[in-house]
């Protein structure tokens, strides 16, 4: 989405009625260590897509993130004021502002920790935990980082609702369970019938970790602690059913 000429050509050829913008640098650590590139993709790319949607009279649905919030209380509602404290979060908020300014018809979907079987090679937390426990390795889940995890198919159902009928504004689509990563690891172990004793609790790291820390500590140290989304308003507006983590994990077994 950083090739503006190619983007324009695609819009001209396809003439889309609805565009769902998922493309982004979504890894927090990558955005922090390469801020210019993250801004180019996440902000400038989103702005250009928004402009082209207006030019070609297409609706835009943009996937944003709970990282637009500061992470100091959790269960954020749609009308809470963003206050990001990571570069990734700042780029997503800036993209939201650009889309609201440039697109004539837009919907923004903020979501939380997404899990499920990946189509591509990229793993997510649930599959990482499954792989570790199957290999007899431990998973250390911190007890101070809270999210509202959502199964990818449930997120897709919400986005599909926005594709089929136009609803302008900001929406929160996430799971019902506000839980820490240790609790999430336990849920994965129990649903998949794996050894839950391999799931170990660790305290959340306060602030940025020291230089030369292990990679997992560096990544964790860049993340806000207490996030998670309150989806009550969105579920009511769109007629969505909210699902628990256990429900989503069980669907992975089907």
What are these regions (language model features)?
Residues 19, 33-61:
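NAD(P)-cofactor binding segment of oxidoreductase domains
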Residues 152, 180-186, 205-247, 251-252:
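Conserved C-terminal active-site "lid" loop/helix of NAD(P)H-dependent oxidoreductases
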Residues 158, 165-217:
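Mid/C-terminal beta-alpha module of Rossmann-like enzyme folds, strongest
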